[in-house]
Structure formats: structure tokens, C-alpha cells
Design a protein with these regions (language model features):
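Active-site-proximal loop/short-helix segments
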Residues: 1, 30-52, 79-99
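A charged helix-plus-loop insertion that forms the helical arch/lid used to bind
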Residues: 1-8, 52-56
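Glycine-rich anion/phosphate-binding loops
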Residues: 7-21, 60-64, 106-108
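Glycine-rich, aromatic-flanked loop segments that form ligand/cofactor-binding clefts
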Residues: 16-40, 62-86
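Active-site loop-helix segments enriched in His/Asp/Glu that coordinate
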Residues: 45-56, 202-209
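Second-shell residues forming the walls of enzyme active-site clefts
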Residues: 63-216, 221-225
């Protein structure tokens, strides 16, 4: 667990993530959906903090240990994925289970790890969070938000890499949006890669997803330009 790694110090972290990266490399895995760069702001947070998924409460601690993780992955040509943008460590709820509003708990310092990695060109991919913050977007949660994914992450923070959604079948999304809405909003928001884990809800086939996206492009509800941009970023 990240919290335990941070308690044992930098040398332990380096050895731990060196071994992990070696295992991934030997297994033929080229991408790790890690590290979590959420700040442990809310001690009662059941999805990040109490599970020990955060390196700490301060952005400096999170940046220090996540940098070690990313560096060990990079040495072995393994892609890292920072998550969960714009921050899930202050939430009270679990987005696996339902709608999560962080309007009154989110702090702008939760962006600090992302600012650091983007500024220093150390980030390959970023994963979105299914959290709602009316101060950032009064209508949609982050994964479906153009204001957050394009205006904030790309235009303001300068991120040029691949943006991947968290599992779109988590109940924060699937209980409030149908497949067509989810695909349309997420793609148009600036998400480049869509994640469907097929664990929490009725399985959705790749054909269903492709057919729905294609239909929405023909209906001019999904931007073809965005599809082309996503393909270029992923390639």
C-alpha cells in the first residue's frame, strides 16, 4: 500500500517499485494504471485514504513517492498513469457506489501533483475521476466535463498526453447516464481512451461501444475531430 511505502522511506520505495516494474516488464505489461496521486485530505475517505492508496496528505509527499514510482516504471519503458484527476482524496463518498460531490471538500492543492508532473514532462497518461464539483463544472462530473478535461487539464495545466477514463460502469456514471450519453459526453470532453471493466454492471461489448460512437458521429453529436485527435495521442 502506498501509505506503508511512504512510512518506510525513499530507499524502500525505490526497491519496492523497482521489483514491481521488473515483474511487469517480465510479464509483457507495458502500462500500469498507477500511481495514485490523490492527497489524503479526508481521513474518512473510504475509496482512497482508508485503503492506504495515497502517499500522504501533503502534495510534497505525494510528489516525492509517486516520482520514484514513475521513474522506476520509465526505466523499463512502462507507461505510468496518474490518477484520479482532478483529485479524489477529499471526497466523502465512493464513486464505485454512486454520485460523489466534492464541491465543499475539494482543495486546489489537489492539482499540485499534476502541475509538477506536467511541468517537468514526467507524465504519460492521466486517469479521470467520476467526481462532481459545481465550482469546476455545474453540470457534469469530471470524466464527462469539457471544462475540467479540456479547459483545465489541457488548456490551463498544459497536459498533452493521453487522458483515460476511470471505469465507466462505476455507479457514479452508469446509474445516472446511459451508454449514449456516457460516450458522447466523455469523448467530447477530451477523454482519449474509454475504460469499461464489465465488473459492476451488465457487460457491454466492444461492438456496442463502436456502433454507438459511429452513430453519434453520423448524427454530429460526437466530434470526429476529437476521435482523430485521440487516435493521434494514443499512437
Amino acid at each position: 500500500r502506498a501509505s506503508e511505502v511512504a512510512l518506510k522511506g525513499e530507499n524502500f520505495a525505490k526497491q519496492t517499485y523497482k521489483l514491481l516494474a521488473n515483474d511487469l516488464k517480465e510479464s509483457g505489461i507495458n502500462t500500469d494504471f498507477a500511481p495514485v496521486v490523490d492527497l489524503a485530505i479526508n481521513k474518512e475517505n473510504k475509496v482512497i485514504v482508508t485503503r492506504g492508496r495515497s502517499f500522504g496528505q501533503s502534495s510534497n509527499e505525494v510528489i516525492k513517492y509517486s516520482s520514484i514510482f514513475v521513474e522506476e516504471l520509465k526505466k523499463r519503458n512502462i507507461i505510468s498513469v496518474l490518477k484520479h484527476f482532478p483529485g479524489h482524496g477529499s471526497s466523502l463518498g465512493d464513486s464505485h457506489l454512486g454520485f460523489v460531490d466534492i464541491t465543499n471538500t475539494w482543495n486546489e492543492k489537489e492539482l499540485e501533483p499534476y502541475k509538477y508532473f506536467i511541468k517537468n514532462n514526467k507524465v504519460d497518461m492521466i486517469m479521470t475521476a467520476h467526481v462532481y464539483n459545481k465550482n469546476l463544472d455545474a453540470t457534469n462530473p469530471a470524466t464527462l466535463s469539457y471544462n475540467i478535461n479540456t479547459k483545465l487539464l489541457r488548456n490551463k495545466l498544459g497536459f498533452e498526453g493521453v487522458l483515460v477514463s476511470d471505469d465507466l460502469q462505476m455507479y457514479a456514471i452508469s446509474k445516472h447516464y446511459d451508454l449514449k450519453q456516457t460516450l458522447t459526453l466523455s469523448i467530447n470532453s477530451g477523454v482519449n481512451m474509454l475504460l469499461f471493466a464489465n465488473q459492476l454492471a451488465k457487460p457491454i461489448s466492444l461492438k456496442q461501444i463502436v456502433d454507438t460512437v459511429y452513430s453519434q458521429i453520423l448524427n454530429e453529436e460526437i466530434s470526429l475531430e476529437q476521435i482523430i485527435k485521440s487516435n493521434q495521442r494514443i499512437n
